[in-house]
Amino acid sequence: MAKKRVADVLVDTLVAAGVKRVYGLVGDSLNGVTDSIRPRKDLQWVPVRHEETAAFAAGAEAQLTEQLTVCAGSCGPGNLHLINGLYDCHRSRVPVLAIAAQIPSEEIGSGYFQETHPEHLFAQCSHYCELISQPEQMPRILEIGIQTAIARRGVSVVALPGDVALRNAVEQEPRLHFPPPKPTVCPADDEIAALAKVLNDSEKITILAGAGCAGAHAELIALAGKLNAPIVHALRGKEFIEYDNPFDVGMTGLLGFSSGYFAMMNCNTLLMIGTDFPYQQFFPKHATVIQIDIRGEQLGRRTKLDYGLVGDTRVTLQALLPKLKQNGDDAHLKTSLEHYRKARKGLDELATEGSERKGSHPQFVARTMSELAREDAIFACDVGTPTIWASRYLKMNGKRRLLGSFVHGSMASALPQAIGAQMAMPNRQVITMSGDGGVSMLLGDLLTLHQLEQPVKVVVFRNDSLSFVE
């Protein structure tokens, strides 16, 4: 039997970690890795036209599946093109491993052709970034990178010189296993009791809920019912919060509704759950503010807190609900809902087809897309005006998903995220809401869709401008 090479061990380790696909663009320095993948039936190489597409696509797959996904780039400019997509993955907290090929190991530090230092370049957009310089480091360094990406929910980068990938591997037993993390952290009983007392004594409560409420829809609705509290949702929380929610009053912030802003600014107590909503100017100045988040480092970093609890949304609310009294005052809720009704009516009136217009205006297109899409469709929207139309006119139902560069705010994310979504979910309908500026940045990857024969529906909103910044 032929002796395994380092690249073979890399591929074996990825498969053991449950990886299904590697998104990337081939290059000489990646030949060892791609040659090792080629005969495999349990790992697919997904070719793209630009490495940034590979990173965005991997991030989308990781977000939808909650499983580790991999992208790869050749040495120097090749893997450097990954960086913008990796920033998005890291800030969105999805588990992605990047394989960054490196120049020949004996040339590192000599100013060689295409020389860069990935272990420095990717340090700010990763939890783990290391160079494998000799076969003895495999698979241990790769395993640590995988475990870190999964456990800390973010990016790991492993740099691998092309010549090292082709060397004979040193036989080593795998050390680590890769169970997906499912934290169920709950605050202490005395913290829950103190929070319940504050809420029971409060009037005019508003809930601001974000993506951290995923999987806790029933508990969140029950909480709002107990407190008679309107729910303002953050953009990333839309898909988890908005549907089947009689307490929802829309978003606040730059893309938000007047009703969401009203509910926030007119509350006496603001309860933030699973959100890192970034815009300080949209927080009330004189309300009591409470924040629940699984990540303790996020408590109080957007606005001054009176109470902060570290906990998983679902188990924390399950512990809290039995201790709450029914709030008998629904005046704040009713007023906020009336504001929402009026705001929603105004937005819906903008989404009607007008005979006086030439062509279809974007609000009408977005609403029509929502009406025609399948009940489990996956939408990927570009930043700028497509995100506005998505946030206001796409109807979520608990089955649909919404992808976008909502934290990093990068142009051109919709098309590559749709590629990753369709590869991961081949039986789901995937639709982009692309801006003409965004789609043009990575236009070459329309060829990727054609090559892969993926049925992504690419909808381009053309306004002949970068309208959100002009």
Listing of model-derived features with the role each one plays in the protein:
Residues 99, 107-114, 300-310, 314-320, ...:
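Thiamine diphosphate
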Residues 7-10, 15, 25-28, 34-40, ...:
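Active-site diphosphate/adenylate-binding microenvironment
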Residues 63, 211-294, 397-428, 440-444:
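Glycine-rich, anion-gripping cofactor-binding loops and their flanking helix/strand elements
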Residues 100-140, 237-339:
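Glycine-rich, acidic loop regions that bind phosphate or pyrophosphate groups
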Residues 9-19, 60-66, 90, 148-152, ...:
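Glycine-rich phosphate/diphosphate-binding loops that line cofactor/substrate pockets in enzymes
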Residues 20-23, 44-46, 64-103, 208-209, ...:
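A short, small-residue-rich loop immediately preceding and capping a beta-strand
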Residues 116, 138, 144, 148-201, ...:
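Conformationally flexible catalytic loops at phosphate/diphosphate-handling active centers
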Residues 2, 136, 159, 171-172, ...:
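Phosphate/pyrophosphate-binding active-site segments
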